[in-house]
Regions:
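Catalytic alpha/beta active-site cores
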Residues: 59, 80-84, 110, 123, ...
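Hydrophobic anchor at the beta1->P-loop junction of P-loop NTPases
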Residues: 208-210
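Nucleotide-state-sensitive switch-loop elements of NTP-binding domains
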Residues: 183-205, 216, 221, 225-317, ...
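Canonical P-loop GTPase G-domain recognition
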Residues: 119-147, 345-425
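Extreme N-terminal, non-catalytic leader segments
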Residues: 2-9, 139-206
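Conserved Switch II/interswitch segment of TRAFAC-class P-loop GTPases
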Residues: 78-83, 284, 302-305, 311-315, ...
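C-terminal end of P-loop GTPase domains and the immediately downstream helical coupling element
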Residues: 156-160, 378-496
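Cofactor-cradling patches in redox/metallo enzymes
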Residues: 29, 36-141
Length: 766
């Protein structure tokens, strides 16, 4: 147990006097987010407002967030290497973009060694915490020190005149963020606020207010609407997003977690177009921030084309956003209870648009009908069909969802009527008001398929026991009839009765069970010899059935049970059986591969040339080549290597860098990938389908090159096709792609879990 000094105990109990804001994240190509999640929870508990970005975040993303959120500190966990380049690049970028006062903190367990800690702190990083610091200070002490060092009022940096925020350059956005801090803290001069509201009155910038229950998917829907606006309008419009989350009443801290859901706010080809600021409700006791009217005025003066406000989760009677926005939107899910509950929801009176998100959930179609009917009642629009009400079924979590597109295409004309300058859209029109084309990974009729599997297995076992009982009784009855006939000829009628009973039972015995019993003597003979012959992929493989120990004893590789009772024999054959035979309890192959030691030639560092050299060193003189490949984190996340420092530091670090088919060919050059003694294991997750395709093409091209070398000509189309088919049948290896583990643990998933599982199924089917 750590014995903390009085100094560290005081740090652990530190509470800030100012509103301290932190941006937290795990570094680029790093999915180890357990540590940073613990740190940000302690930060929240100490009263800090935390803008959490999650894992796999580039320096540019973190710095942009810190500047727009006007945070005092950045906290980064880095467990995947490349930390020296990452942190130095962050310090450089902060200085270059007007955030030199923002303090950077980091940690990475034992990955960041003392010499590197000294180097980074000397470069300008506020503090890198080591495991020894954790032991000495305790987690709360470490976080307390971070909060104490960042406990400053940033309102002093706010601009004194409105000209500083009029414009859409990075400098204007930085000044806008600093002004918002002063407005939030109540430190902006009254004269400046009066001028701000006076200037805002002269603008015609539409404001959309998105509100709804907690967990309804407001942030994801906001992100998808912004994505469609940017795609549809050629990324010509500039958007401000104001996102509000609740403060914790006990500690004063807050998790400002909406930014983690935003995937469409980064710079595209035309550069930055979306400014985002997260606000905490603080002590206002509402779903909005007390500073929201001032913040909206600042955004209008800054000259954005559109402002989107997303509130924190609300209850049935809340509608505080309505007077502050031009277009209120209510987001809900199909789970609201009885239809009468809809009569209690205040926002259904005020919302111009209603989105029933998570439309894939049970009862969604009924919810769409009921909500549309309630909106019709609220508006007394009985001359209009409920289907024409502005109620939409959406699935914001689904790529290119037509329900979200329908909502966007209904919203855009309303925004245009309020002054938004829209061009002719490029998105095709959709003719629906809710999500369609819902293809479930597991069809509705098979959602119980795991239970079906369990039922099938239990049923099979019951059948095996019943069949074994029949086999035993048949053997017993026939043996009794034989003994009666031999011992007492006058008992012929009893003997016939026994045979009749046996025949009746034989009729109930399955054909498969009869065949197993018929083949039992042949199986005994086959395993009693010195060799066993089995066919695998049209190849006849002979295997010695005995193994001689060091003491000269002969031991059989497969020993059959010495049963004579037909019931026991059949039960064993149906429930256990020999290796390579159903139900495969002892494996799918009859015997283990011989002539190949179970070694693992593990390599992966630097580029393909270096790792190939390492493979050759490891496998030198070995008859079997069992190559096990580790890929660097850049490859694991499906990205290309780059000279940008936060990427460059991770290229070839703790794994080989593979970005192209040519890299893959170099990696395995000199190894015959279709040789039966060659096996390749690849530890890859997110981009597993792509890497597997590269490997297959490497093996195919290797054999096409071999054909050219052997025959002095190009293969014909038919010959090439036969070579491809032969390679796919004969190549050996393993793709270690456990996407469910990644979803829960290391986070190297670049597609959704559902999509990844579907692709894995498609590959298996192919």
């Amino acid at each position: 147990v750590t014995d903390l000094s009085a100094e560290y105990k005081a740090l652990a109990e530190y509470r800030p006097t100012n509103k301290v804001r932190f941006v937290t994240a795990a570094s680029l190509f790093d999915g180890h987010d357990a540590a940073i999640n613990i740190m940000r929870r302690i930060l929240q508990g100490m009263g800090a407002e935390v803008i959490h970005l999650g894992h796999n975040r580039s320096v540019d993303e973190v710095v942009t967030a810190a500047l727009q959120e006007d945070a005092q500190g950045i906290a980064i966990s880095s467990y995947q290497g490349g930390h020296v380049e990452y942190f130095k690049y962050m310090v450089d970028l902060l200085k270059a973009r007007g955030g030199e006062h923002i303090q950077v903190f980091g940690g990475g367990g034992g990955v960041i060694v003392p010499a590197e800690i000294a180097e980074l702190q000397g470069y300008g990083v506020a503090r890198i915490y080591s495991p020894e610091d954790g032991q000495r200070m305790g987690l709360a002490g470490m976080i307390g020190e971070m909060v104490m060092r960042c406990d400053a009022d940033l309102s002093v940096y706010a601009p004194k005149a409105l000209e500083a925020i009029r414009g859409q350059t990075e400098a204007h956005w930085r000044a806008l963020a600093q002004l918002m801090t002063a407005l939030e803290n109540g430190k902006a001069p009254d004269a400046l606020k009066s001028a701000l509201h006076a200037a805002a009155k002269d603008t015609d910038i539409p404001v959309v207010g998105i509100t709804g229950t907690g967990g309804a998917g407001k942030s994801s829907l906001t992100d998808e609407l912004i994505r469609r606006l940017r795609l549809d309008q050629g990324d010509a419009l500039r958007v401000a997003v104001i996102s509000i989350d609740p403060s914790r009443r006990k500690s004063g801290g807050a998790l400002l977690g909406d930014r983690i859901r935003m995937n469409a706010i980064g710079p595209w080809n035309a550069g930055p177009r979306v400014f985002m600021r997260s606000l905490a409700t603080r002590d206002f006791g509402s779903e909005i921030s007390q500073a929201l009217p001032d913040v909206l005025a600042a955004c209008k003066v800054a000259g954005f084309d559109l402002i989107v406000v997303e509130t924190s989760g609300i209850g049935q009677g809340d509608a505080a956003i309505v007077p502050l926005v031009d277009v209120p939107m209510y987001v809900m899910t199909p789970e609201y209870g009885a239809a009468s509950q809809l009569e209690k929801i205040d926002m259904l009176d005020f919302a111009e648009f209603v989105a029933i998100n998570k439309f894939d959930r049970k009862g969604a179609a009924d919810a769409l009908r009921d909500v549309a009917k309630q909106v019709q009642r609220n508006r007394s629009a009985f001359q209009t069909s409920p289907d024409a009400m502005p109620v939409f079924g959406t699935m914001a979590s689904r790529f290119n969802d037509d329900g979200v597109t329908a909502l966007y295409q209904a919203l855009l004309p309303r925004l245009a009527s309020l002054g938004l300058k829209v061009a002719e859209g490029s998105l095709p029109q959709v003719d629906t008001r809710h999500s369609t084309h819902q293809v479930a990974i597991v069809p509705g009729a098979r959602v119980r398929y795991l239970a079906d599997i369990a039922d099938t297995v239990r049923g099979y076992k019951r059948q095996a026991i019943a069949q074994a009982r029949l086999a035993r009784e048949i053997q017993q009855l026939r043996e009794a009839a034989r003994m009666l006939t031999e011992g007492k000829p006058d008992k012929a009628r009893a003997s016939e009765a026994a045979i009749d009973l046996a025949v009746k039972r034989e009729a109930k015995l399955d054909a498969d069970a009869k065949q197993l019993l018929t083949m039992w003597p042949q199986m005994q003979a086959a395993y009693a010899g010195d060799e066993y012959v089995v066919k695998i992929r049209d190849k006849e493989i002979r295997t010695a059935l005995t193994h001689t120990t060091l003491s000269g004893s002969k031991i059989r590789k497969v020993a059959l049970p010495q049963y004579e009772d037909h019931g026991e024999i059949l039960k064993w054959l149906m429930l256990d059986n020999v290796p390579g035979s159903f139900p495969y309890t002892a494996g799918t192959f009859a015997f283990k591969r011989e002539g190949e030691d179970p070694t693992r030639m593990f390599a992966g560092e630097g580029d393909a040339f270096r790792t190939n050299k390492r493979f050759k060193l490891l496998s030198e003189g070995m008859p079997a080549k069992r190559l096990s490949t580790a890929f660097d984190s850049v490859t694991l996340y499906g990205n290309d290597p780059d000279l940008r420092p936060d990427i460059y530091g991770k290229v070839g670090n703790s794994g080989v860098s593979i970005a192209t088919l040519e890299d893959m060919k170099v990696l395995y050059s000199g190894f015959d990938l279709t040789n039966p003694a060659t096996s390749v294991s690849m530890t890859i997750n997110g981009p597993a389908p792509t890497i597997l395709a590269m490997f297959m093409n490497t093996a195919i091209d290797q054999n096409l090159d071999k054909f050219r070398a052997d025959n002095g000509r190009e293969p014909t189309a038919d010959e090439a096709q036969k070579i491809r088919a032969w390679v796919k049948e004969n190549v050996r290896g393993t793709v270690q792609a456990d996407i469910l583990k990644e979803d829960q643990g290391q986070n190297t998933c670049i597609f959704s879990t559902e999509f990844s599982l579907k692709v894995m199924g498609d590959i298996a089917e192919y």
